[in-house]
């Protein structure tokens, strides 16, 4: 017997504002940890001070050129992470080396809070600075709900869904969207707009989606859809 014939089809879960609970979206060790003072100091530096410190350590770098790079705003690649290695060369030169960029980076669940009074931490920072402005530039007349699509890391993906609900003050669909799902809870209608299926087998239009889909996303996410996708393929 085929397993898909036994298990019920996956469906989107509706997340309401006010449902965020920190213990669901951080590892206990990180949630109870205190961030290192040096790291916290760096994260609170102004852009100008960061540029000055970097140019002091790298005299050949021009401050204006670095400022221009930091001012650049991508059209499509709005959210990224990087894997870094602290390396030392044969001549004893130490530096950080970027070995990979990620379009759906993880790490929020491992990052201690920089401010104990802001319990949503980096989740809210990302949503307020990136996703909210992205959604507010919506296409004229496009109706529908918001969604978080994921195929990994439910601890963080659900955290983003809960924070989006709080920031945008509306319900958000939290949607599993796996590469090998024979009956996925996501489809596109005749107008090329995304729809998601809830637990009652009802389909809902989506005007914008936060992508946490990493395994061959091009197999499932249409390039030419009316739904705005945060970090499209």
Which sequence ranges carry the predicted segments?
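Preference for protein termini
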Residues: 1-233
């Amino acid at each position: 017997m085929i397993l898909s014939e036994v298990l019920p089809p996956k469906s989107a879960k509706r997340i309401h504002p006010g449902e965020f609970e920190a213990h669901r979206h951080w590892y206990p060790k990180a949630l109870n940890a205190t961030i290192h003072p040096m790291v916290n100091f760096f994260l609170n530096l102004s852009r100008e001070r960061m540029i000055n410190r970097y140019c002091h350590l790298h005299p050949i770098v021009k401050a204006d050129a670095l400022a221009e790079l930091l001012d650049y705003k991508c059209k499509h690649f709005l959210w990224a992470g990087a894997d870094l290695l602290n390396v030392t060369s044969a001549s004893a030169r130490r530096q950080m080396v970027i070995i990979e960029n990620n379009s759906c980076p993880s790490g929020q669940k491992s990052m201690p809070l920089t401010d104990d009074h802001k319990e949503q931490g980096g989740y809210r920072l990302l949503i307020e600075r990136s996703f909210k402005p992205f959604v507010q530039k919506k296409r004229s007349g496009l109706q529908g709900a918001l969604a978080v699509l994921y195929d990994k890391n439910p601890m963080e993906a659900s955290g983003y869904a809960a924070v989006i609900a709080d920031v945008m003050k509306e319900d958000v669909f939290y949607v599993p969207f796996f590469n090998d799902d024979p009956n996925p809870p996501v489809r596109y209608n005749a107008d090329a707009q995304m729809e998601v299926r809830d637990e009652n087998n009802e389909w809902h239009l989506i005007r914008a989606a936060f992508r946490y889909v990493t395994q061959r996303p091009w197999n499932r996410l249409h390039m030419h859809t009316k739904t705005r996708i945060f970090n499209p393929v």
